[in-house]
Amino acid sequence: MAPFVAIALLVLLSLSGLEAIQHAPKIQVYSRHPAENGKPNFLNCYVSGFHPSDIEVDLLKNGKKIEKVEHSDLSFSKDWSFYLLYYTEFTPNEKDEYACRVSHVTFSTPKTVKWDRNM
């Protein structure tokens, strides 16, 4: 029984150490289809490689939060880092600017990544 207790203790200690690990998210902003002015599309913000899991993601239009946004379930990779996809339907045009704003413990201030329609 003593070996079992020792192994259980080691597992618990290693799991508690995961909370101390912090990885900044990688942020990718892209449209589902190539951008065409006046043609409906989907704006995606893929946030990956972050730890811990607490994160706030907003899609922005001209600097203002878009309210009707959906997202995937929080998932994790083999290395225990997390990833999410936030998306919304939008119709691009020449004047509007779109971006993704992410708040995470690894950032001192929220990070905003603009959508590049040519990507």
Curated annotation (Swiss-Prot):
One of its GO terms (cellular component) is extracellular region. Gene3D superfamilies: Immunoglobulins. Residues 1-20 form the signal peptide. InterPro entries: B2Microglobulin, Ig-like_dom, Ig-like_dom_sf, Ig-like_fold, Ig/MHC_CS, Ig_C1-set, MHC/Immunoglobulin. PROSITE patterns: IG_LIKE, IG_MHC. It comes from the Eukaryota. Disulfide bonds join 45-100. Residues 25-114 form the Ig-like C1-type domain. CDD domains: IgC1_beta2m. GO terms for biological process: antigen processing and presentation of peptide antigen via MHC class I; immune response. Keywords: Disulfide bond, Immunity, Immunoglobulin domain, MHC I, Secreted, Signal. It is found in: Secreted. Heterodimer of an alpha chain and a beta chain. Beta-2-microglobulin is the beta-chain of major histocompatibility complex class I molecules. Component of the class I major histocompatibility complex (MHC). Involved in the presentation of peptide antigens to the immune system. Belongs to the beta-2-microglobulin family. This is Beta-2-microglobulin. It comes from Cheracebus torquatus (Collared titi monkey).
